[in-house]
From Swiss-Prot:
PTM sites of type Phosphoserine: 150
Start and end residues of each stretch annotated as Interaction with host CALM1: 8-43
Family, similarity comment: Belongs to the primate lentivirus group gag polyprotein family.
A Pfam family assignment: Gag_p17
The protein's name: Gag polyprotein
Chain positions covered by the region annotation Interaction with host AP3D1: 12-19
Length: 521
């Protein structure tokens, strides 16, 4: 391999394999990257032996630096690899490629006092922390200079407006693309919009109103001494009566800096918000979930309309907690109410997942078919009678006596004796009214049957009743005798005269008073 194998040795190879290609990435440098860099140096007329020392790597960086801004991806990768090798020769601790480029940059600035030899993508920016190298205002050699916006940024802004048509996404998109811009750059972005001139006119009117308010709140002080920077007016902030140099001086002066770029951005954001309300007239109260709409689509529409609402965050929070559940369809609302108080959005989406989709439709269809094909329910009383039916002929359950195949049982079905039927069975239970002639047994107050061999506690029969019955029989007999015809009576008297006594007892009864009174008289 020649010089390639002597570029890094021992601990330097181990340190190389710990450096990441990108910040936070998983891939790390390997020896194959050194071999590739050595092969690429030949394309630029540079010797591979330059990679073996720190000074040689610095010469390579000096040659490649002017070509990096307009170079290809291979050229940029070669420059990054050489920076990493330079840090390894200088025994600098680095974690990734970006860290190596920053260390090389600081070293060259300390040696030469200028950053002109470094690529524009790695030069430090003047604004505070968090601002990258693409900012329009950059600090080069201690001086602030303006770099125009790239065509890519302007194209992204125009494409955003054309696709979203002043939707709720336009405001945050403008904030991201205009970060750190001067009023001059912001006016360039607005002038690139060809369509939607009505919205542009609304933004211009808002800018004029805000500029007038600025002039009222910040009156002009007295006459300024010669050479002193004047204070910005409303038209200066809008970029119509000020130059780019004045705007940069107002933004980055040491005493009392005025961020004219951020102020102008805030005015335009107010105008964009009015355009969003004009192009999206849908009210958040009118956003309701359809009967067959998935809950996730409804939530997306809800938050899109909520994003366009320019209200207080507390009001938006109340809308989220109240209207999101209130405007859902009945199926989702029933599920959401079962989640308790103040459920999270993740819990709502998980609980309502599948509602309104094909899966739920299939389940509802299956339940409907199941109910339609199910047999008619049997009333409880009828079911009880069917379960407790019993045959009185054989005593078995499951059929009636009419359907019984056993021989017909004779006599009473209750006691088994002949001469009566079950309705007149003397052994049946007596109710409160006793066993009457009616065919139904009383159901109230059942009385237990008295066992045989026990003497009942009822009093004996009254003898006066027997005596009265006897008197009644005698009275009937005497009445029958009185009603005998006269011929029979004369025949009896004739027989007496002839000495015959065929009816002696009857004659004596007629001749004595016994016919009227009993023997006790």
């Amino acid at each position: 391999m020649g010089a390639r194998s002597s570029v890094l040795r021992g601990k330097k190879v181990d340190e190389l394999e710990k450096i990441r290609l990108r910040p936070g990435g998983k891939k790390k440098y390997r020896l194959k990257h050194i071999v590739w860099a050595a092969n690429e140096l030949g394309k630029f007329g540079l010797a591979e032996s330059l990679l073996e020392s720190k000074e040689g790597c610095q010469k390579i960086i000096t040659v490649l630096d002017p070509l990096v801004p307009t170079g290809s991806e291979n050229l940029k990768s070669l420059f990054n690899t050489v920076c990493v090798i330079w840090c390894l020769h200088a025994e600098e601790k680095v974690k990734d490629t970006e860290g190596a480029k920053q260390i090389v940059q600081r070293h060259l600035v300390a040696e030469t006092g200028t950053a002109d030899k470094m690529p524009s993508t790695s030069r430090p920016a003047a604004p505070p922390s968090g601002r990258g190298g693409n900012y329009p205002v950059q600090q080069i050699a201690g001086n602030y200079s303006h770099v125009p916006l790239s065509p890519r940024t302007l194209n992204a802004w125009v494409k955003l407006v054309e696709e979203k048509k002043f939707g709720a996404e336009v405001v945050p998109g403008f904030q991201a693309l205009s970060e750190g811009c001067t009023p001059y750059d912001i006016n360039q972005m607005l002038n690139c919009v060809g369509d939607h001139q009505a919205a542009m006119q609304i933004i211009r009117e808002i800018i004029n109103e805000e500029a007038a308010d600025w002039d009222v709140q910040h009156p002009i002080p007295g006459p300024l001494p010669a050479g002193q920077l004047r204070e910005p007016r409303g038209s200066d902030i809008a970029g119509t009566t000020s130059t780019v140099e004045e705007q940069i001086q107002w933004m980055f002066r040491a005493q009392n800096p005025i961020p004219v770029g951020n102020i102008y951005r805030r005015w335009i954001q107010i105008g964009l918000q009015k355009c969003v309300r004009m192009y999206n007239p849908t009210n958040i109260l009118d956003v309701k979930q359809g009967p067959k709409e998935p809950f996730q689509s409804y939530v997306d529409r809800f938050y899109k309309s909520l994003r366009a609402e320019q209200t207080d965050p507390a009001v938006k929070n109340w809308m989220t907690q109240t209207l999101l559940v209130q405007n859902a369809n009945p199926d989702c609302k029933l599920v959401l109410k079962g989640l308790g108080m103040n459920p999270t959005l993740e819990e709502m989406l998980t609980a309502c997942q599948g509602i309104g989709g094909p899966g739920q439709k299939a389940r509802l269809m299956a339940e409907a078919l199941k109910e339609a094909l199910a047999p008619a329910p049997i009333p409880f009383a009828a079911a009880q009678q069917r379960r407790t039916i019993k045959c009185w002929n054989c005593g078995k359950d499951g059929h009636s006596a009419r359907q019984c195949r056993a021989p017909r049982r004779q006599g009473c079905w209750k006691c088994g004796k002949s001469g009566h039927v079950m309705a007149n069975c003397p052994e049946r239970q007596a109710g409160f009214l006793g066993i009457g002639p009616w065919g139904k047994k009383p159901r109230n107050f059942p009385v237990t049957r008295v066992p045989q061999g026990l003497t009942p506690t009822a009093p004996p029969a009254d003898p006066a009743a027997d005596l009265l019955e006897k008197y009644l029989q005698q009275g009937r007999k005497q009445k029958e005798q009185k009603m005998r015809p006269y011929k029979e009576v004369t025949e009896d008297l004739l027989h007496l005269e002839q000495g015959e006594t065929p009816h002696k007892e009857a004659t004596e009864d007629l001749l004595h008073l016994n016919s009227l009174f009993g023997k006790d008289q």
